[in-house]
């Protein structure tokens, strides 16, 4: 599968975790064990096809240790879990002034649709468990980072 699909700017920040949890005032807490905490940003130009490319990249990215070699196993290889948090602030532009601009981030309606699609398709792709934060709400995210190891991803 080619990762050059469309003209979107979807961004993700992946963090390897031993466990992670998200809670909010509007939903039950969600938690995972060993796997990835995924902060997902959606641009106005993003599509379901671009989200699918990001999913493919995430589940096959070899960032987990195995056997005697570093970085030779993927999320699928380790039967890992994923916690996905919507994060429009990944599109912060701080190049001017003292207040960030988020003009490249998708409108909430579009971002929520792509976020839901991403989570549903990620779940179908096979990680052990996929949990999600509540879109559009203030959340408390707790993570026990492993490494620490964080990887920014962009699908152009």
Show where each model-derived region lies.
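N-terminal, polar/charged subdomain of small-to-medium soluble alpha/beta proteins
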Residues: 2-97, 101, 112-156
